[in-house]
């Protein structure tokens, strides 16, 4: 690490780290050659490999630091030794191993503790734990917000659907495209824009890079399946990201009806039942043509039962719900209902492998 001339930007947070890492790397690529974490090689094994993989010709390296247990961030930070950092939304991810979400924020904030004085930390002023993160930063804080016009970078969605950004330091404004699916991506894009502007990126180059961005992996991967649209957002799931995906899907342009295939959110510990029931209630408040609940292993598992309980408590009709025993059964239920013009959102934690539903649906019956 000490031999690398690249300016290293560390990416931390609970929700959207890999997407934000890709965005920051794409935008910094308009300034100079930029390395990035391959996939999500972000733990005690993957992060050192990521550092070792940075070419000495790179001007920047955007590397992700991910933790799941207390005490893990400081060693990662000391390997990474970032020159700057970007923190995404903090939420109850891996809450099974922490006493509270605040404890998660405190752990992740360790990434900010040894930033150089000439570096920066991009933090979301709208995040509940902004004060916690700010208190840990040893570098100047660059605040972003979609609500507070006084932030260093204030963003709002224009009537045409673009992200209208105002840079406080210069007074400059720019209308930038929001990567698909829009909605929650505006916050990730604003953080990436703030980081890139701190490193000298030009507005025009940022607009072009955002317009060219495409999601990676099973992150809002859109494909046509015999006339209906599959939106595979099954890379991972937590209470924050599921609600964001539901909101984005509700606004997604669809000619026909919207269906959901939902699976458990893992590593919620003692909050598992309450969080799944709350998500079930949130689903029940939406306008969907049908909801398939997909278990990790068996329909009787508590997370699926809690989702179903939340749906019932929210008044969701039983005839529009399928509590499937497995992915194949969920696919059969959906196959009988999906028609050309419809759309299906798939969302669950990685361990559920909810893409199995889509794989079954793509097979001819």
Predicted regions and their residues:
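Residue-level signal for inorganic ion chemistry
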Residues: 11, 47, 64, 76, ...
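ATP-dependent carboxylate/acyl-activation modules
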Residues: 11, 217-220, 343, 351, ...
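Short SAM/SAH-binding signature in class I
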Residues: 60, 84, 191, 338-347, ...
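A short acidic, helix-capping loop that chelates divalent metal ions and anchors anionic groups
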Residues: 92-98, 231, 265-270, 346
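Active-site beta-alpha connecting loops in nucleotide-dependent enzymes
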Residues: 215-218, 234-316
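Phosphate-binding loop of NTP-binding sites
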Residues: 1-125, 129-137, 336, 359-364
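Acidic, Mg2+-coordinating active-site environments of NTP-dependent enzymes
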Residues: 86-229, 281-290, 299-314
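Short acidic-hydrophobic, aromatic-tinged amphipathic segments that line or gate anion-handling sites
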Residues: 319-330
